[in-house]
Amino acid sequence: MRRGKKGVTGNVTTIYYIEEHGDPNEGCDPNDEDSTEPQYLIKWKGWSHIHNTWESEKTINDQKVKGLKKLENFIKKEVEISWWRQQAGPEDIDYYECQSELQQELVKTYNNVERIIAEQNRELEGGGTAHEYFCKWESLPYADATWEDAVLIEKRWPVEVEHFKSREAAKSTPSRHCPVLKRRPKFHQIKEQPEYVGKDSSYHLRDYQMDGLNWLIHSWCKDNSVILADEMGLGKTIQTICFLYYLFKSQHLYGPFLCVVPLSTMTAWQREFQQWAPDINVVTYIGDVSSRDIIRQFEWSFSSSKRLKFNAILTTYEILLKDRQFLRSFSWACLLVDEAHRLKNDDSLLYKALKEFDTNHRLLVTGTPLQNSLKELWALLHFIMPYKFESWEDFEKDHEDAATKGYEKLHKQLEPFILRRQKKDVEKSLPAKVEQILRVEMTSIQKQYYKWILTKNYSALRKGVKGSINTFINIVIELKKCCNHALLTKPEDFESRASLATSDAVEKLLRGSGKLLLLDKLLCRLKETGHRVLIFSQMVRMLDILAEYLQRRHFPFQRLDGSIKGELRKQALDHFNAEGSQDFCFLLSTRAGGLGINLATADTVIIFDSDWNPQNDLQAQARAHRIGQKNQVNIYRLVTARSVEEDIVERAKRKMVLDHLVIQRMDTTGKTVLNKRDASGTTANNPFNKEDLNAILKFGAEELFKDDEENDEDPVCDIDEILQRAETRDEGPAMVGDELLSAFKVASFTFDEEKAVNELKKDNADEEPKDWDDIIPENVRKTIAEAEKLKEMEDIYLPPRRKNQLQNNADGGRRRRGRSGDGGDGDGVDGDGEAESDASDGEASADDDRPRKRGRPPASHREKIKGFTDQEIRRFVKSYKKFSAPLKHLDSIACDAELQEKPLAELKRLGEILQERCKAVLSETAEPSEQNEGRKNNRKTFKLGGVPVNAKTLAACQDELAALDDFLPQTKEERLKWQLDFRTRPANFDVEWNVSDDSKLLAGIYQYGLGSWEAIKMDSSFEIGDKILTNEDKKPQAKHLQSRAEYLLKLIKKLLDQKNGKQKMKKPRPKRANKEPVTKDIVEDDGSSAEDKKTKGVKNDKTEKGKLKIEEVSTHDETSNDKKEKDKKRKKDEDRKGDKSKGRKKPRQRGNEGIPGPMHFTANNEPRALEVLGDLDPSVFEECKEKMRPVKKALKALDNPDQSLSETEQVSRTRACLTQIGTQIDLCVEAYPDSQKVEWRSNLWYFVSKFTNFDAKQLYKLYKYGLKKNEASKQKDGKHKENVKTNNRNNHNSINHLKSFKKNSNSKQKSDTNDKKEKKMKLEKEKTDKHDKNQHTSGVKRKLEDGECDPEPNDNKRHERYVVD
């Protein structure tokens, strides 16, 4: 948004016009409101971003464009941001502006052509042609590619045009006849870097990278697929790409190469290909269905010869599994898998899917040491060399004693297939890495909060190992927050610090954390000496506090956490690494960095808080200690002394060494093999059990409570001593596999007193473990307990919560607040990016003395399915519903639910549990027990883990799809040949669709599940990919395919039932009381007598209490109130009529007693009941509304009758409106096929019933009766219809005939003269309320039903087919 010159809008504001002719808005003064106006940068649908124009609200409205709601939302958002700026602090505004600037930089890249993928000559409307290029834009998916004018593209991006031309004319495309695919050449060592490697020879391989390249080439020549397992940071990506480029240039093997990499490293792989192998045509096969369709159409092969265009495909695991049928149809010269440790489970779908690919060579790349068992190592070896490592049992038998006798035999067998090297071994120029643990004391406020948290959770802690592990974890997390900073435990309002001077605010921040006090001294000294620093923390809110501190200290910094996305992240990294950058610090989230981040320009790493898993901290250190680093890397790990944090670090080091890493060295290469798992039952995210957590919580707690509470002096530290020790050089671990231990140089700094950590641990080991009663003093416990009781009593008398407070409680989804007592201490506050519950929740759940609160049960009490999270279970259940006989299609379910890495055995176990519980719940609800006697037994749901599952819905889905499994062949080859052998109704799609397409659709559903239309479209074997999901405007789309599939499934189920001799169960109907034709009550014959009607099918008109039976109300009545009002009005009418009405029976009553209601008549078929549906679907209602728009006046006349007309005229007018409305309905229904006519006739009459007190059945019956009488009048009157007297006489006769059709009418025959009739009607009208519109309408309704007036003559030729002769 901007303020621009008035009228400077439209095409003259595009970037290419401005570059050629200058900016017409130049010199504009935004403050001059008279000559300027608000303008908005508009992205036009179907046009690329280079065609964006600045528009004002007036120009947009003048063009009458669609999508104005987007502009309204944008303006609304700008107003909200403007209001927020007035309330927010300067730090928040600065951060927002930084993010906005980075976002604008990202948007600018949308104007750059990344790749031209096609060209065409488009015919112009006025004659001639226009040459165009199909352009893929930078940072945007292929789906956003657009056709652009060739002149414009050639002028702005001539290099991309040249690259496109060279790709189109290239002869270096894949061929199956390449000789080296069948016979590998003899190996020749490469002693110098080839000239073609590295763009313009500006990139050079290091010695160890040349060795790695030679090893890869040697393995390929020996026909050995291999695993490259170098440590992170040694350039595995570069070595791999250079290997492919060697095959391309030296062996003339042009592919195709399939590279499967994580999405997070996709950009890095693209960049490295451009730099190291520029001649390889690499296509990134990612994106949605539309993007992948465009790639297959324009980037995959030449249209003329079907030869492959590309040399290498970059894709992800997820896309590969979605399109595995398509990708598996090609023969790949080389399969490359990055992050290959994801293939460690040989029972996972990902493993099995990739293993089936036809590949000539396989290369696995992993930088993560294998972690758990020898079988995982065998799984990788079996993947690359299935014939060499065929049997796991044999492999295990050969090496079962390796742990005791040594790994020499195993090394000898693995040497040709695995290469693992570490930085300290191969990169001698890489400086040393020195790590120190700096123990710091807590400040006085931290000690106070730490004691509060322990005391407050006393009832949960005293349970010890009997308590909930989740409760212990929550308490540990709260204590870790307190160790970092007091503000994480009890947040203060921002204004309390914003109003302070800078020095006072910094001092207040420092008093809240002993770590921050040490960090302040350390950073000041590091900045003076020219160092650059990386600061890591797990907690996002801690990064916020550090950012505030750095800003107030005026230290320039960058920040990277999970909220900062890919392109913005790249810009922050580039800014920090830029030559001459003034950035001093880089704040990083420990887990958000991911692989591929290079911050080698920094030489100091500060780990503010340690991760549960030391492996994550090692990866954090590697951000600076990697190739390109020229200085010694100093690593400072800050640990709060005598706290849970100190014990966690020590235990995590020991446990990770015992459970995970055993790295063995052989010759000059490192080989990764593993001992069998120690059955500890822990995970990498939480490597501690209950005993560990209980001991961690007790560590240092007793001494903390014994400290002199009056000693509130804040600590002071000697920074010179810290820096002196940091200069000590660490030569690296001497023992193999000792990277995790690192032989830390431990420095302990205490502020009040000096204590040896080893002595403290020795003393603790000698003592018996103390109980929490001995650790927390009794007086402290009593004080906290009294405070909690007092707060509980206050809560009882608190007024209702304000609306904004409720909103705050609801903020963030279902995040749970702390229970009573949490607010005071703030230890239950969430927001650090940790997925935890409040510690007090665990306390409440563990406290047996308190009554159980209603609501969701605690997480610790919920069932947990081993190996699956609730989110994974939810996806599994959703996919489970899509398949017939789902336990036979577990591989397809795993792919659909994105559970490809789960073993099929675990998936089968989960499926069986789901199936068993569904059957159990349905059997329970089918057989009511004594306990459920007297109440409804409608429980149809059950819990699978923490996921609720509707058993009835699940069973219904399985029942719908069950016939598919019995009907279709079991093998895919037979299914592709299989054809439906019965006729189906036309599909009415915009493409040609026949029985063969229906057969392929069912085969696709069998294989990929109901609703997986994208996967079916992708599978070329079904040959319907070009017919379905073509574009948004053409059928069939997903909803049309869903309807067609449901129809076909019903058909095959019906056929199977007939084949098996099953008959469809029908609902029992009441026996008909008479044998008369079903049309008797709809179209009455003129000769019928009142007596006949009284005796046919009529039950006693009295109820059990002797009262008159009230007419039933249609199911379309929206509320019971309407029904009551109708009953009251009807009762008043009956009372007003007196004894004359007691014997009257209405035709609709008789229909309710066994005779069907309105019928649908056709010339060739028997009459069918007109089904009157319930409330219409909103979309159907809107369609009905549009169809009935031509008779809008007639509908209004029904809704608002003219009160000045007499009742006779009112009846006549109503019948005329009904005739007009019915004619319109018949016209609308004619457009539908016979199978849908009945449904739409019901829908439209139901729509009309909303304008009257009549229901749909009554309206349709009256309409058909009017048509019959009009037809009879026309036949009787002949050509004398124009005679007014004759018409009046016919009117008079019709009235008499209608009178004879009154049900059970015992009243005296009315007078034949109109004068007597009008006189009687006037007397009746005096008895009713003339101003009551509904009462008047009720009289009209009664007249219409009794047939006391004949409708006006109408031309009803269109309705002759519905009249029964």
Curated annotation (Swiss-Prot):
Q: What class of enzyme is it?
A: hydrolase
In residue numbers, the region (Disordered) covers 795-868, 1058-1163, 1271-1365
Q: Name one GO biological process term.
A: nucleosome organization
Residue ranges, compositional bias (Basic residues) = 1061-1072
GO terms for cellular component:
chromatin; nucleus
Localization, UniProt: Nucleus; Chromosome
- Residue ranges for motif DEAH box? 338-341
* Annotated EC: 3.6.4.-
Q: Name one GO molecular function term.
A: ATP hydrolysis activity
Spell out the Basic and acidic residues composition-biased ranges: 1073-1082, 1090-1125, 1132-1141, 1271-1284, 1309-1335, 1354-1365
Q: Which InterPro entries match?
A: CDH1_2_SANT_HL1 (IPR040793), CHD1-2/Hrp3_HTH (IPR056302), CHD1-like_C (IPR025260), Chromo-like_dom_sf (IPR016197), Chromo/chromo_shadow_dom (IPR000953), Chromo_domain (IPR023780), Chromodomain_CS (IPR023779), DNA/RNA_helicase_DEAH_CS (IPR002464)
Please list the residue ranges annotated as the Helicase ATP-binding domain. Answer: 217-387
Feature: compositional bias, Low complexity: 1287-1296
Task: Indicate yes or no for the key word Repeat.
Answer: yes
Q: Report the residue ranges that make up the Chromo domain in this protein.
A: 16-86, 111-176
Q: What domain notes does the record hold?
A: The 2 chromodomains are involved in the binding to the histone H3 methyllysine at position 4 (H3K4me3). The CHD1 helical C-terminal domain (CHCT) binds DNA and nucleosomes.
Q: Which family does it belong to?
A: Belongs to the SNF2/RAD54 helicase family.
Q: What does this protein do?
A: ATP-dependent chromatin-remodeling factor which functions as substrate recognition component of the transcription regulatory histone acetylation (HAT) complex SAGA. Regulates polymerase II transcription. Also required for efficient transcription by RNA polymerase I, and more specifically the polymerase I transcription termination step. Regulates negatively DNA replication. Not only involved in transcription-related chromatin remodeling, but also required to maintain a specific chromatin configuration across the genome.
Official protein name in the record: Chromodomain-helicase-DNA-binding protein 1
Q: Which gene encodes it?
A: CHD1
